[in-house]
Swiss-Prot record:
Protein name, UniProt field: UDP-N-acetylmuramoyl-tripeptide--D-alanyl-D-alanine ligase
One GO-annotated biological process of the protein: regulation of cell shape
Reactions performed catalytically: D-alanyl-D-alanine + UDP-N-acetyl-alpha-D-muramoyl-L-alanyl-gamma-D-glutamyl-meso-2,6-diaminopimelate + ATP = UDP-N-acetyl-alpha-D-muramoyl-L-alanyl-gamma-D-glutamyl-meso-2,6-diaminopimeloyl-D-alanyl-D-alanine + ADP + phosphate + H(+)
InterPro entries from the UniProt entry: Mur-like_cat_sf (IPR036565), Mur_ligase_C (IPR004101), Mur_ligase_C_dom_sf (IPR036615), Mur_ligase_cen (IPR013221), Mur_ligase_N (IPR000713), MurCDEF_CellWall_CoF430Synth (IPR051046), MurE/MurF_N (IPR035911), UDP-N-AcMur_synth (IPR005863)
Residues noted as binding ATP in the record, renumbered to the chain: 138-144
Keyword Transcription: no
Entry EC number(s): 6.3.2.10
Function: Involved in cell wall formation. Catalyzes the final step in the synthesis of UDP-N-acetylmuramoyl-pentapeptide, the precursor of murein.
Protein family according to the UniProt entry: Belongs to the MurCDEF family. MurF subfamily.
Molecular function GO labels: ATP binding; UDP-N-acetylmuramoyl-tripeptide-D-alanyl-D-alanine ligase activity; UDP-N-acetylmuramoylalanyl-D-glutamyl-2,6-diaminopimelate-D-alanyl-D-alanine ligase activity
Gene3D superfamilies: Mur ligase, C-terminal domain, Mur-like, catalytic domain, MurE/MurF, N-terminal domain
Taxonomic lineage: Bacteria, Bacillati, Actinomycetota, Actinomycetes, Mycobacteriales
One Gene Ontology term, aspect cellular component: cytoplasm
Swiss-Prot/TrEMBL keywords: ATP-binding, Cell cycle, Cell division, Cell shape, Cell wall biogenesis/degradation, Cytoplasm, Ligase, Nucleotide-binding, Peptidoglycan synthesis
Amino acid sequence: MIDLTVARVTEIVGGALVDISPEEAAERRVTGSVEFDSRAVGPGGLFLALPGARSDGHDHAASAIAAGAVAVLAARPVGVPAIVVAPDPRTGDGGLTGVLEHDADGSGAAVLAALAKLAKAVAAELVAGGLTIIGITGSSGKTSTKDLVAVVLELLGEVVAPPESFNNELGHPWTVLRATRSTDYLILEMSARRPGNIAALAAIAPPKIGVVLNVGTAHLGEFGSREAIARTKTELPQAIMQSGVVILNVDDPAVAAMADATVARVIRVSRGSYSHPGSPNSPDVWTGPVSLDELARPRFTLHTRDPRAGATEIQLGVYGDHQVANALCAAAVGLECGASVEEVAVALAATGPVSRHRMQVTTRADGVTVIDDTYNANPDSMRAGLQALAWIAHGGTHDKNQPGSCARRSWAVLGEMAELGEDSITEHDRIGRLAVRLDVSRLVVVGGGRSINAMHRGAVMEGSWGLETVNVADPAAALTLLRAEVRPGDVVLIKASHSVGLGALADVLVGDGAIRP
């Protein structure tokens, strides 16, 4: 974070000084990071007192000060120097009530509202000094694209990007406050669970470059329809000023339509060839035919409208055909910021999975390949994961009977896709059937409930008999089964929504065998 006095922070957030005099607040400076975990606080830091599942941050204020924090941003006095922003029903909290699960009295919402004010002020000052902000949204692929963009932009300057998927009302402003005066590029993921979320995040740190990847069915339960999801994703292009740039994946018709919703310049990316110059959605950055290697890493030729750039071969270091659109968007960001096509190609080739549990492919010493894609799941990403599994297991083809293929036994260990609302039963049924159509050898459905039953039943109805498809109670039961029956050379995909907890299973399964160099 930029260097600010405690007095200035208090002024920005509209708080009151408690257990610290105005004179001392004018002298004390926040020179470290802003943290919501007291164990992460260091000298010069600012601690956010937020309610949690196991404890309330207000109860850890003293330990944060002892660790070097200069003050605590809190909703009530905490017995140590604090900036207090008590909940005020007359002014509201900017729609932040309910964001934190364990926030019965609204104290967490008050602190989040203050955090947003602080991040907004810091972002404005840094943008005035030359910072470029990139915002990324989409129903799937945000984190993978963020990681790719970060690696490309690191060629050009200092980059700040969120770890993992810090993309909500807490993670977004927290990431903004990681930026300093030496930061050149700030990359932000923007997620949404209700209309207005993306607009609110964009108002905190207005992006100069906005990227929209796709409109899918993630969080369909909250929005009610794909059209409502599209309207919310459109909030990002609408937030970009005329001097900015919007990058759209026009292979998704809902995203292509967003070009009409922005006053900014539009850069279109597509997997299709550039065959219709002048048509509304003719791309500015596009690929030739895409091929996959034996581990489903895409290779393609990158084309741009710049006649000086020519066509450039790119071999991605990440896994899955679905990564092509993410890489195209990352390339478009890099080119817009001044990277050459050759620099983009080198960066994308050198980048494997960065964030944990997202298409991490590991081959153990015994030849078992584990595809860990357990961070989250929705119908689109689940289909992509199954297609990658089939490709790797069938030796670089989706058809194990194709001449030259070297089929390996495949396992799909799948859990629930959360937040799909009324479509949950149908979507889980489709995934079960798809696993059979892709000739997955063994399908292990983890958990219980109507959606999981639909996935299991869908596979059975599609023709999976006997022990080819099983339903186990929990991740522990799945691990027991895998340890007993996985053989050297098998390929195992593990995927579900984060709440299912399959990430720990993937970690153990990978650790069961030394990794092949």
